[in-house]
Regions:
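Conserved phosphate-binding/catalytic loops in two-lobed NTP-binding clefts
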Residues: 224
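Generic N-terminal amphipathic, Lys/Arg-enriched alpha-helix
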Residues: 1-12
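Alpha/beta enzyme core
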Residues: 1-3, 18-44, 51-71, 80-199, ...
Length: 225
């Protein structure tokens, strides 16, 4: 995270459930010489078995080396953990990092749950991603009191490509397609001012319209359409 912040680039995170998806992720990361976060959801753990997923990730490191990547930067991450027990299970299994998503809880309960996960994970040098939502004015208090290592915020992206409700969208008059609501870059800017250099996580990149990809590229990104 520190190198990414200093270098001005983002680290991609991809969910995988099976070998074929993992091969595609590692091949792309190796070809682009990019660090990568391998994400496992609660559902993937139930489907593919957490032990198998852990050793698949270890195999991914060796696979990246075989593709010419001498020092692969690959981590295994729990995506959207919803309980301390789930987070603890992943930490105990050897995950590099975990996410605890308490954003649906009242603010103080979110802090309490996140702090509990952070205190446990940090004993094993495991980093913790937390989720706050859209309240930019609370990011300093939240990050300070929980000790989280990165923070997921909501600026208008959605988890997955088609998870916006129709009433949240507008309809393109030319194509008739539903267009997701615009991204709240003002919130992102405000949070960056409040917590300069703190790792911010944006979920749901598969739903970002091309116009916003163009804006990212305008300010130094390198994302083909």
């Amino acid at each position: 995270f520190k190198r990414a912040v200093k270098g001005g680039y983002a680290i991609p995170a991809f969910n995988f459930n099976n070998l074929e998806q993992l091969q595609a992720i590692i091949t792309a990361a190796s070809e682009t010489k990019s660090p990568v976060i391998l994400q496992v959801s609660k559902g993937a753990r139930a489907y593919a078995n957490p032990i198998l997923l852990r050793y698949m990730a270890e195999g991914a490191v060796e696979y990246a080396k075989s593709l010419g990547c001498n020092h692969p930067e690959i981590v295994l991450h729990l995506d959207h953990g919803d309980s301390f027990e789930l987070v603890k299970g992943c930490v105990d299994l050897g995950f590099s990092s975990v996410m605890i998503d308490g954003s649906s809880l009242p603010y103080e309960e979110n802090i309490e749950l996140t702090k509990k996960c952070v205190e446990y994970a940090h004993q094993f040098d495991v980093t913790v991603e937390a989720e706050l939502g859209v309240l930019a004015e609370e990011v300093i208090d939240f990050s300070t009191r929980t000790g989280c290592d990165s923070l997921a915020i909501s600026i208008g992206t959605s988890h997955g490509a088609y998870k916006f409700k129709p009433e949240q969208c507008t309809r393109d008059p030319k194509t008739g397609r539903l267009v997701p609501p615009p991204l709240a870059f003002d919130i992102l800017h405000e949070i960056e001012e409040k917590l300069p250099g703190f790792p911010i996580v944006l979920h749901g990149s598969s739903s970002v319209p091309q116009e916003f990809v163009n804006i990212i590229n305008k300010y130094g990104g390198n994302m083909p359409g």
